[in-house]
Amino acid sequence: TDTVADTHTLPLEERQHLLDLLSQTLNQDPPNVETTRECARLTHHFAQQQTHPHERALMLALPECWPLLQALSQDDRASVRVVLGHITQGQALDMSRFGVGLQAIETERALDDYTWLVAGCVGEFWTDLCIRHVPDFSSLPNEEMMDLGRQYGMGLQRLNILRDSK
């Protein structure tokens, strides 16, 4: 979804449509054949327009991810869907907010909301997976670990913002 959101050489409307379709496809359980096929078609079209070969390869490989998602346990599949739902929501917000050029995020609250959507939720996601799959992951309580994961992700996104502002 990062590739879709960040490919500024393609029209904003195309990127928004594909991001929405990816989100729809991700949340179908079981997958809808027609939607999955349309997503693959648009992804292939989108990939052909990529100038970076690794981004192109990533986009072309996307349809192979849907069966892998289905192979995950129900809990892990739900976690993937939740985190990608938050991320795509943040990316859609990015595209609508910054689609016509850079604009400042006006308040600390708006910055926190943004950094949580695109990165804090990722820290929570990985913490959740580790709690679920890594015995004795931490001696700290799970809630405290989730808060640390969230803060870590949000902090990394703030660093990305500073890096990108140069």
Task: Outline where the language-model segments fall.
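Acidic catalytic motifs of isoprenoid enzymes
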Residues: 1-166
